[in-house]
Amino acid sequence: MAVTVSAEEWVPRTRVGRMVKEGKITSIYELFEKNLPILEPEIVDYLVPDLKHEVLDVSLVQKVTDAGRVTRLRVLVVIGNEDGLVGLGMGKAKQMRFAIQKALANAKLNITPVRRGCGSWECTCGEPHSVPFTVRGKSGSVEVILKPAPRGTGLVAGDVAKAVLRYAGIKDVWTHTEGETRTTHNFAKATFNALKQTYKFLAPWDWVQQQ
């Protein structure tokens, strides 16, 4: 549904985009490690061609102008490769197609890595199927706490949080939520913000990898 630009047609507008197009950067994780900003959605298309997406919410919004009330569609989209990358974006437009395109572009600009692990004391498989430690995220009145779960538990969460977790590659997790979780946007963003916390600090088992 989104309009993507092929590698040949893409003309980078930023320094990072030119570095990607010239082959100086070959992995999206290089951008995260070097703290380089993603200012063009085509950068993500170029480096992560296997991204999937899902529309989480569609709602009508109105804006009062001199010409009267203007009604537009507001779309919330989650993207991810189900292997440690996830993004969340919102787009507004009069037509569904363009609203989804804007939401996808914003989700790509917001894409973030997710550190996965086997953080539950009940599980010693060592596989990256859950979160490595307890993390929490907040958006508006909604707060989401993600706790490591043993293998086979599944995603113990609401439908909106499940979608965000699934696209991030999380397979087993316990969740605790507070606030008005019926607000899809805040629920999704709180879950997304919690996942971002997995990269805020290093666990002891990551120290050796960073040396």
Swiss-Prot record:
GO terms for molecular function: rRNA binding; structural constituent of ribosome. Residues 51-114 form the S5 DRBM domain. One of its GO terms (cellular component) is cytosolic small ribosomal subunit. Pfam families: Ribosomal_S5 (PF00333), Ribosomal_S5_C (PF03719). It comes from the Archaea. Keywords: Ribonucleoprotein, Ribosomal protein, RNA-binding, rRNA-binding. InterPro entries: Ribosomal_Su5_D2-typ_SF, Ribosomal_uS5, Ribosomal_uS5_arc, Ribosomal_uS5_C, Ribosomal_uS5_euk/arc, Ribosomal_uS5_N, Ribsml_uS5_D2-typ_fold_subgr. One of its GO terms (biological process) is translation. With S4 and S12 plays an important role in translational accuracy. HAMAP family: Ribosomal_uS5_A. Part of the 30S ribosomal subunit. Contacts protein S4. Belongs to the universal ribosomal protein uS5 family. The N-terminal domain interacts with the head of the 30S subunit; the C-terminal domain interacts with the body and contacts protein S4. The interaction surface between S4 and S5 is involved in control of translational fidelity. This is Small ribosomal subunit protein uS5. It comes from Ignicoccus hospitalis (strain KIN4/I / DSM 18386 / JCM 14125). The gene is rps5.
